[in-house]
Amino acid sequence: DKLTNESEITVLTTEEEVVDALSEGDKGTVIVDETVFYATMGGQEGDKGVIKTSEGEFTVETTIKLKGGKIGHVGTMTKGMMKVGDTATMEVSPAYRADTCKNHSATHLLQKALRTVLGDHVEQKGSYVDPDRLRFDFTHFQSMTKEEIAKVEDIVNEKIAEAIPVVTDVMTIEEAKKTGAMALFGEKYGEKVRVVAMGDF
């Protein structure tokens, strides 16, 4: 995945209003034509990073999806100034993205391990993922025993230790079902789907 791109600034806001420019110390939102930043969605926190222009630097503290599908980069103008129409260099924090991706992958390992230990009735009902932690909500009909928790933990840790490559492929929904791919909670799928595999997980 790309971590940098150049794009034109199309909209700037402070916390109260749409503006033509942001100056050092201003808190606000930057909207550009195209971005490499992932927005907060599906329980996963959005990217952090910086947006640079020839005259200033904006620290992105979170990234959100706005009405109409645009992406908002929320943060603080930390140096100089920037204005609508400027060309900006978008830079995602590589460490933040990598750690978030690792925890996102861990939710998939956890789901498979839970289904292996508890049964196929286990389904994801929600999750939260950021670089430091994850939470995974799932269906089950009783509290897990200490032994079940230990088994699930062992399976996930074994798979992490194996350093299994993550392989992605795009295929039709029918082809995905034939491979045994699991659909995720709350997702709506089009004709083509992205399938992620980690070994036999």
Indicate where each model-derived feature is located.
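A glycine- and charged-residue-rich anion-binding loop/surface
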Residues: 1-201
